[in-house]
């Protein structure tokens, strides 16, 4: 079934599911999107697709009724990052992110850049430790902490800078909710329904486990985008989350 802009542009989803769009071809991406319902998920656009297809892709998704998480992980000097975040807000995205390792001044500048947008500002999230990274990877970078310890340090800095939350692994979610409170949003990649392959993620969880751990928004990619029936897969995931809740 195809959901057109006219039928779904006002749709609001309560689902915590964010589907990662990872396509090399715009037409294939939109063909997939036209098979799913914006009431069942939000969509994430990352570096590859945004580089290939630009802001118009985001507009195409919004016209179909979807909230968009612009996953570009800005990491630059404060002024440049602030301008990029403001540009994302102008585009009307639902969520945008920066790297917490950019430091406090960069994150504060990004936060301040969203002040003029008021209630229409996107959620501003910081990336802590990429879910593909393990202790050995951090050691190669001169970081002697474990991924969990380093992520918590960066999450604390993020909260102190007034951002809305962090991207973290599901394994860190329980601790983060305890330390940073319920209002601090946790966005988690590496979520895969039981039976899915791990792919290039190293620290993964099922949707049900993630919800129990305190994750607010869970990013799911290939288990949905490569499903023979993605609409039904999304409905099954959401149904399982409602049972878990």
UniProtKB/Swiss-Prot annotation:
One Pfam assignment: OMPdecase
Catalytic reactions on record: orotidine 5'-phosphate + H(+) = UMP + CO2
Pathway(s) where this gene product acts: Pyrimidine metabolism; UMP biosynthesis via de novo pathway; UMP from orotate: step 2/2
Superkingdom classification of source: Bacteria
GO terms of biological process kind: 'de novo' pyrimidine nucleobase biosynthetic process; 'de novo' UMP biosynthetic process
An annotated Gene Ontology molecular function: orotidine-5'-phosphate decarboxylase activity
Active site residues of this protein: 73
Protein name as it appears in the record: Orotidine 5'-phosphate decarboxylase
Cellular component terms per the entry's GO annotation: cytosol
Keywords: Decarboxylase, Lyase, Pyrimidine biosynthesis
UniProt similarity note: Belongs to the OMP decarboxylase family. Type 1 subfamily.
TM region positions: none
Subunit structure of this chain's protein: Homodimer.
SMART domains: OMPdecase (SM00934)
Residues spanning the signal sequence: none
Function: Catalyzes the decarboxylation of orotidine 5'-monophosphate (OMP) to uridine 5'-monophosphate (UMP).
Entry EC no(s): 4.1.1.23
Matching Gene3D superfamilies: Aldolase class I
């Amino acid at each position: 079934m195809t959901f057109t802009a006219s039928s779904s542009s006002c749709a609001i989803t309560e689902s915590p599911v964010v589907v990662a769009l990872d396509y090399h071809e715009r037409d294939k991406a939109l063909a997939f999107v036209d098979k799913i319902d914006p009431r069942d998920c939000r969509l994430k656009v990352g570096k590859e697709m945004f580089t290939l297809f630009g802001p118009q892709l985001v507009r195409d998704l919004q016209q179909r009724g979807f909230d968009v998480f612009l996953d570009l992980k800005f990491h630059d000097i404060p002024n440049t990052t602030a301008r990029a975040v403001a540009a994302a807000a102008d585009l009307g995205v639902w969520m945008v992110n920066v790297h917490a390792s950019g430091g406090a001044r960069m994150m504060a500048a990004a936060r301040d850049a969203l002040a003029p947008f008021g209630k229409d500002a996107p959620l501003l999230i910081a990336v802590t430790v990429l879910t593909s990274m393990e202790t050995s990877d951090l050691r190669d970078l001169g970081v002697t902490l474990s991924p969990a310890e380093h992520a918590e340090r960066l999450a604390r800095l993020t909260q102190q800078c007034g951002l809305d939350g962090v991207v973290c692994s599901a394994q860190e979610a329980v601790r983060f909710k305890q330390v940073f409170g319920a209002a601090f949003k946790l966005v988690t990649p590496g979520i895969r329904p039981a039976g899915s392959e791990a792919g290039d993620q190293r620290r993964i969880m099922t949707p049900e486990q993630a919800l129990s751990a305190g994750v607010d928004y869970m990013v799911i990619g290939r288990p949905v985008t490569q499903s023979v029936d993605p609409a039904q897969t999304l409905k099954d995931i959401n149904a399982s989350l409602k049972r878990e809740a």
